Amino acid sequence: MENRIKRPRVDGECVKSINNGEFDRWDVEDTVAYLRGEGLQEWAQIFKDNGITGAGLLCLTEAHLEKMGVSPLGARLHILHCLQKLSQISTEPMKVFNDPIHGHIELHPLLLHFIDTPQFQRLRHIKQLGGTYLVFPGASHNRFEHSIGVGYLAGCLVKALNERQPELFITKQDILCVQIAGLCHDLGHGPFSHMFDGMFIPKARPADKWKHEIASVQMFDHLVEVNGLEAVMLHHGMRLPEDLIFIKEQIAGPLESAVLDQSQWPYKGRPVEKSFLYEVVANKRNGIDVDKWDYFARDCYHLGIQNNFDYQRFLRFARVCEVKGRKHICTRDKEVGNLYDMFHTRNCLHRRAYQHKVGNIIETMITEAFLKADPHIQIQGSSGRIFTISSAIEDMEAYSKLTDHIFEQILYSSGPELSEARAILQNIICRRLYKCVGQTTSETNVDVSQEKLLDWAKELARSKPTGTEGNLIAEDFVVSVIHMDYGMKEKNPINNVHFYCKNDPTKAIKIHKKQVSKLLPERFAEQLIRVYCKKTDDKSLEAAKKYFVQWCMDRNFTKPQDGDIIAPELTPLKQDWHAREDEDEEEEEKHRQNQTLPHHTPQRTGRNVKVDLFQARGETKL
C-alpha cells in the first residue's frame, strides 16, 4: 500500500489570520506554512524561492505558476483551488446588470450591499446633468446609473493592470476597494447635481468652502454605519479600518491636512508602492480617470452628441511605470493625440451642453427659488432635529432625504410663504425664462466672486447709452461667468501624463505639445461672461442689449458677436474693436494674395512670357 504523506498542521497564527481575512499580511514563511498545511510541501519551496508573500497569493494565475516551475497541470489547479479558499472574493457569483452604455456588466456581491441601501438608492432621484434636462429632452439619466458605471470601469482598469503586470501584486481587496470608491464617489451630490454645490450653497452659505466630495465621504461613513456594512466587509476579506480609509481617500484625497513636504507620502490607506491605485477613480494628477470615461459615454448617449473617446483602447495600452519613486498609470506614446481628443471632447460637452446658455439660466432660476424657499422647507434629521435645504449638509440623515423632489415640493405647495419661490418655478415650467442679452470675454481671466458679479450688475445698470429708452436697474440683470478649460484651469493636463514606448515599456517619458501637432490650443482656459435680463418684454430687452454693448466698451471686453446689429450707433465708437477687425482683414487679404500669386513663373515687364518646360537649358522662346 502506498505510504500517505501526513499533512502537517498549519500554524495557529496562520489560521487566525485566514479567519480574519488578513492573509495578505503574511510574509514568505507564513505562505510556506500554509502551503505545507494544505499538503503542498512539494511546491512550497518554489514559493519560497520566488519570495511570494500573502499579498501576492490571490494574484497568481495558472500561467504564473507554470513560469515559476509548477509543471503538472493538476498541481497548478490544486494550488489555485487552495489559494481561492483563502478568500471568498474569487468564488462568489457575480451580479449581472444590463447597462445601455457598457452592456452586460458584472459586479461583485459585496458591491450590492452598498447599492441596496437608502443612501445609494437616493441617487436614482438626482439628475446627472441637473437643469440641462430641461433643455436636452434625452438627458434624463441620474447619478445612480453613472455611479454603477464608474464602479464597473474602475474594476476593468485595475483588473487590466493586474493581468498585464502581475508583479504589481494587486490584491482582490485592492480591486474591491477601488470599485467601491467608484461606486460611492458621488454619494454627496445634492439636488440637481452641480447646481447645488456650484450655485446654491455658495449663495446660501458664502462663508463655507463646501464640496460634494467631502459630503460623499460623510455620506459613505453614514451608509456604512447605519447599514452595518463593516461586518459584511470583514466577511468578504476586507481589512478594516485600512480599506475604509483607502476608499475615502480615493473619493476626496488625503483625509488629513496637506503635507508640507511634497516628498512625503500623504495617504494612509495604501503604501506608496501602490500609488497608481489613487489615479483610477479621481485622478488628481492629470484628470484621466474612469469617472470621465463613464460620463463622456453616458452623457453623449443621452444628449445625442458624438463621443470621440474610446476608453476600451486606453484599457488595452494602460500600464504602470515608476516615476521618481512613485508608480503612475501610463499609456503608449502613440495615444497622445487621442488624449488631446479626450480633453477636447470634455470642452465640447461643456460648450454645447453643460454650459448651454438656456440650461445655465434655468439653473440660476432654480437656485433663486431654492434660496427664497430655504427658510421654509423643513427636513428631519438625526435625533429629530429639523434642517433647511442649506443646513441639511450638516446632517447626513437629513441630507439623504434631499433630492430633486424639492423642486416639485415647492412647485406644488400652497402656502403663502413659498409664493415667490413657487412663482419662479412656474415661470420655468411655462418657459418664461430670463433672456440672454449677450456674451463676451475678457482679455485676461478675472477673479470672480459673488460680490464681483453683483458689482458688475450695478455697473450694467449705470451703462445706459445716450438716447436709449427705458430704465433698467441692477436687479434686472444677471451676470454669469463660465470657466472653460481642459480640466486643470490654465494648465495643459497632458503635461502631467507619462507615456511609454514600444521599445522599452518600463520607462516613462513625457511628450511635449510641440511634438504632437502645431494645431493644438495655445491656451487651455478662458472665461465667458454672459448677461441675462429678467425683464422679457421687447422694449426692455432691446434696451438691455444696448446697456450690455456699452458696458463691454467701458470694460474693454471683446465685442459681442451681434454688437453691430443690436447697437450699430455704439460699436464704431470703440476704436480697439475696429482696429482688431482691420488687422484680421489685412491678414486675410495677405493670405488671399499669397494663394492667387503664380508660383515659379518668370515675369518680364511689358511682355508675355511663355515657358517651354521641355526646352534645352539656356534657351528661351519669346
Swiss-Prot record:
Activity regulation remarks: Allosterically activated and regulated via the combined actions of GTP and dNTPs (dATP, dGTP, dTTP and dCTP): Allosteric site 1 binds GTP, while allosteric site 2 binds dNTP. Allosteric activation promotes the formation of highly active homotetramers.
Compartment(s): Nucleus; Chromosome
Residues spanning the membrane: none
Cofactor or coenzyme needed: Zn(2+)
Root EC class: hydrolase
Positions annotated as active site in the UniProt record: H212
Residues that coordinate or bind GTP: K95, V96, D116, Q121, R124, R431, K435, K502
Residues engaged in binding dGTP 2: N98, V135, R313, R332, K334, N338, H356, K357, K502
Cofactor binding note from Swiss-Prot or TrEMBL: Binds 1 zinc ion per subunit.
Residues that coordinate or bind Mn(2+): H146, H185, D186, D291
Reaction(s) the record says it catalyses: a 2'-deoxyribonucleoside 5'-triphosphate + H2O = a 2'-deoxyribonucleoside + triphosphate + H(+); dATP + H2O = 2'-deoxyadenosine + triphosphate + H(+); dCTP + H2O = 2'-deoxycytidine + triphosphate + H(+); dGTP + H2O = 2'-deoxyguanosine + triphosphate + H(+)
GO BP: dATP catabolic process; defense response to virus; deoxyribonucleotide catabolic process; dGTP catabolic process; DNA damage response; DNA strand resection involved in replication fork processing; double-strand break repair via homologous recombination; innate immune response
Alphabetized UniProt keyword annotations: Allosteric enzyme, Antiviral defense, Chromosome, DNA damage, DNA repair, DNA replication, GTP-binding, Hydrolase, Immunity, Innate immunity, Manganese, Metal-binding, Nucleotide-binding, Nucleus, Zinc
Keyword Nucleus: yes
Polar residues composition bias: residue spans: 594-606
A GO-annotated cellular component: nucleus
Keyword Membrane in record: no
Residues annotated to bind dATP: Q128, R143, H189, H194, K292, Y295, D299, R346, Q355
Location, primary (coarse class): nucleus
Domain SAM: 26-89
Domain of life: Eukaryota
Family named by the database record: Belongs to the SAMHD1 family.
PANTHER family assigned to the protein according to its UniProt record, in alphabetical order: DEOXYNUCLEOSIDE TRIPHOSPHATE TRIPHOSPHOHYDROLASE (PTHR11373), DEOXYNUCLEOSIDE TRIPHOSPHATE TRIPHOSPHOHYDROLASE SAMHD1 (PTHR11373:SF4)
Function: Protein that acts both as a host restriction factor involved in defense response to virus and as a regulator of DNA end resection at stalled replication forks. Has deoxynucleoside triphosphate (dNTPase) activity, which is required to restrict infection by viruses: dNTPase activity reduces cellular dNTP levels to levels too low for retroviral reverse transcription to occur, blocking early-stage virus replication in dendritic and other myeloid cells.
Identification of the protein by name: Deoxynucleoside triphosphate triphosphohydrolase SAMHD1
